[in-house]
């Protein structure tokens, strides 16, 4: 590792001025850190994906209808459920990493609680769609037998959706604690784990690396547990008890519960939550507006791209079985290769967010540039490898020579597409770390749905380029998106991003409250401070009214660490607003249930 850093130092010595301007100082150390952080995250993503693959493999041996049903069910669950939860929970990438990088680490626990409540509410509209799976599929002219079995699978999967949401949220809770723990005395910001952020701290202690592994590897272990349970359950329910598609759905549910319970117990038993958890707090009901201002763009940023792939598969189904099969093969290749930039994207998001939370804009820029340069090299290698193996990859998935020939024609285009898509993915991590998801959502929406897909449809159906036309349109899309992300981040105001990170972590409001509370005189008529006699360490701060809250289950230090919400709502306001949110979500579910009943009768 020292040699890597020495190499970078030589580059900055003047032998290659152009390279020294491109490569940030400390690039070797930062690249190693990103790889160490994203490596387990890559394995975690692969293991999550494997649960659905195993279900498909078991049902594939039952027949074509069963295989089509499970494939369609997994796609429906992902598009109408999982993608929404993953997108909304991506707000935690910004909020948790920035809060953990700040001195106000207990705020991470509040964000976890807030995210759990929001995602549970979002389950209700998703369930409304799940209830009407068969009717939706028939509306799109899918096979009746396939639609019926797909409905069975999705109905069984309904209780598994909140479990998947919770599992994803717990994973983000760990991911965004970064290079963790135990080095308070080394950090210039009094922030555990941030000493590595500075070039002067060129090597990691074994203790810090061991503690870092405690944060990242539990996710991988939970994925291993989930896959083992899934394999055994599928064998028992599908192959032994002959429950068919229903058995596969039950196996999926069981595995989701198993890995979620394992991860939760691991966090509690290993006490990984102590630094960031101050107990249940009513503050999780506050500040939903800022949360949604990040969550909705995050969801759109992810779902826009995710849904574009599904639309592409649907369009290929309108052509022929050969085109659809070739698209399915390329989709599987794309999914596997995407896991690498996705893991690195999460690592970059964590590093950038923690650095901004610690007000270290130099390190934030270093992490962003290092991540982008790393993925450029990796994606070029992968793209070249895919092009070289274009005639062999198709044989892994099928024996049909027509499909294999078509796949080999399209893979060179996909290999170029992968390079730009991977760069976009890592830039997405930079945008999440800086809290700029809205720009990413706008770029993805424009490039995919105004440029990429329309161009792909034109080339596919009008120019008659078939599947090649679709991927050429997608290539134009990611090329333009990459150009937009490069231009935007080059002009990004990192100091302003650090100030916004201070707001996200709750430090700004806390500092204002503390500074104002110490002023004498008439200021107290606006903001009053009351210190309890029994616990002088607890300060109860109120804005323009004398409402206060004491949690006797917290220590004085923990209560002091929790920040005041940006705009505190009264109990009455909370009941009205959160009750309205619950009512709206419940009404959506009731509408879905009503539609199902009426459609079934007719």
Swiss-Prot record:
Consequence of substituting residue 64 to N: Found in a patient with renal disease; uncertain significance; abolishes TEA transport activity; decreases plasma membrane localization
Keyword GTP-binding: no
Substitution effect: residue 247 to V: Found in a patient with renal disease; uncertain significance; abolishes plasma membrane localization
PANTHER family for this protein: MULTIDRUG RESISTANCE PROTEIN
GO cellular component, as recorded: apical plasma membrane; membrane; plasma membrane
Cytoplasmic topological segments: 1-33, 88-119, 175-219, 270-289, 349-368, 424-442, 488-578
Compartment annotation: Cell membrane; Apical cell membrane
Superkingdom, taxonomy of origin: Eukaryota
Keyword check for Transport: yes
Protein name (record): Multidrug and toxin extrusion protein 2
Function: Multidrug efflux pump that functions as a H(+)/organic cation antiporter. Mediates the efflux of cationic compounds, such as the model cations, tetraethylammonium (TEA) and 1-methyl-4-phenylpyridinium (MPP+), the platinum-based drug oxaliplatin or weak bases that are positively charged at physiological pH, cimetidine, the platinum-based drugs cisplatin and oxaliplatin or the antidiabetic drug metformin. Mediates the efflux of endogenous compounds such as, creatinine, thiamine and estrone-3-sulfate.
UniProt-listed InterPro entries: MATE_euk (IPR045069), MATE_fam (IPR002528)
Amino acid composition bias (Polar residues), ranges on this chain: 507-518
A molecular-function term among this protein's GO annotations: antiporter activity
CDD domains with a match to the protein in the record: MATE_eukaryotic (cd13132)
Disordered: annotated segments: 503-529
Keywords: Antiport, Cell membrane, Membrane, Transmembrane, Transmembrane helix, Transport
Gene Ontology terms: biological process: organic cation transport; transmembrane transport; xenobiotic detoxification by transmembrane export across the plasma membrane
Predominant place of localization: membrane
Membrane topology category: Multi-pass membrane protein
Catalytic activity field: thiamine(out) + H(+)(in) = thiamine(in) + H(+)(out); estrone 3-sulfate(in) + H(+)(out) = estrone 3-sulfate(out) + H(+)(in); creatinine(in) + H(+)(out) = creatinine(out) + H(+)(in)
pH dependence: Optimum pH is 9.0. Active from pH 6 to 9.
Family according to the record: Belongs to the multi antimicrobial extrusion (MATE) (TC 2.A.66.1) family.
Transmembrane segment boundaries: 34-54, 67-87, 120-140, 154-174, 220-240, 249-269, 290-309, 328-348, 369-389, 403-423, 443-463, 467-487, 579-599
């Amino acid at each position: 590792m020292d040699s890597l850093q020495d190499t970078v130092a030589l580059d900055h010595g003047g032998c290659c001025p152009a390279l020294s301007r491109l490569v940030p100082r400390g690039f070797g150390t930062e690249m190693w850190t990103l790889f160490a952080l994203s490596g387990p995250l890559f394995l975690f993503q692969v293991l999550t994906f494997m649960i659905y693959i195993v279900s498909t493999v078991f049902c594939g041996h039952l027949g074509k209808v069963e295989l089509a049903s499970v494939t369609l069910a997994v796609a429906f669950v992902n598009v109408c459920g999982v993608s929404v939860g993953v997108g909304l929970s991506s707000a935690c990438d910004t909020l948790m990493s920035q809060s953990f990088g700040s001195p106000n680490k207990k705020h991470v626990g509040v964000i976890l609680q807030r995210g759990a409540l929001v995602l549970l509410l979002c389950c209700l509209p998703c369930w409304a769609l799940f209830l009407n799976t068969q009717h939706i599929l028939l509306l799109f002219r899918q096979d009746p037998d396939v639609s019926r079995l797909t409905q069975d699978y999705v109905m069984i999967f309904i209780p598994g959706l909140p479990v998947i949401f919770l599992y994803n949220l717990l994973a983000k809770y760990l991911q965004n604690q970064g290079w963790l723990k135990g080095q308070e005395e080394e950090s210039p910001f009094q922030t555990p784990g941030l000493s590595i952020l500075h070039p002067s701290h060129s090597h990691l202690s074994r203790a810090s690396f061991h503690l870092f592994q405690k944060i990242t590897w539990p996710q991988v272990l939970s994925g291993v547990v989930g896959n083992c349970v899934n394999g055994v359950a599928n064998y028992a329910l599908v192959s032994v008890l002959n429950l068919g598609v229903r058995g596969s759905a039950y196996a999926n549910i069981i595995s989701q519960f198993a890995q979620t319970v394992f991860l939760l117990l691991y966090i509690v038993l290993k006490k990984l939550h102590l630094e960031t958890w101050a107990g249940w707090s009513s503050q999780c009901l506050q500040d939903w507006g800022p949360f949604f201002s990040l969550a909705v763009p995050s969801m759109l940023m992810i779902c826009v791209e995710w849904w574009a792939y599904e639309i592409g598969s649907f369009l290929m189904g309108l052509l022929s079985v050969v085109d659809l099969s070739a698209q399915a093969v390329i989709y599987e290749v794309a999914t596997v290769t995407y896991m690498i930039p996705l893991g690195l994207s999460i690592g970059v998001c964590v590093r950038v967010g923690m650095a901004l939370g610690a007000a270290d804009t130099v390190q934030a820029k270093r992490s962003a540039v290092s991540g982008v340069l790393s993925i450029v090299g990796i994606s070029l290698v992968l793209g070249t490898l895919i092009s070289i193996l274009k005639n062999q990859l198709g044989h892994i998935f099928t024996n049909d020579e027509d499909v294999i020939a078509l796949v080999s024609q399209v893979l060179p285009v996909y290999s170029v597409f992968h390079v730009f898509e991977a760069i976009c993915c890592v830039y997405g991590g930079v945008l999440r770390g800086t809290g700029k998801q809205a720009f990413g959502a706008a770029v993805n929406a424009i490039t995919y749905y105004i440029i990429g897909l329309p161009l792909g449809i034109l080339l596919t159906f009008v120019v008659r380029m078939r599947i090649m036309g679709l991927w050429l349109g997608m290539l134009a899309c990611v090329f333009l998106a990459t150009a937009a992300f490069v231009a935007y981040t080059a002009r990004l105001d990192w100091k302003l991003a650090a100030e916004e990170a201070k707001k996200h972590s709750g430090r700004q409001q806390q500092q204002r409250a503390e500074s104002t509370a110490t002023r004498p005189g008439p200021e107290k008529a606006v903001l009053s401070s009351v210190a309890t006699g029994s616990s002088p360490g607890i300060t109860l701060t109120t804005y323009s009214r004398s409402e206060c809250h004491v949690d006797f289950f917290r220590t004085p230090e923990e209560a002091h660490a929790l920040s005041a919400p940006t705009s505190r709502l009264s109990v009455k306001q909370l009941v009205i607003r959160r009750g309205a949110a619950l009512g709206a979500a419940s009404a959506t579910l009731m509408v879905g249930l009503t539609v199902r009943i009426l459609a079934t009768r007719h």
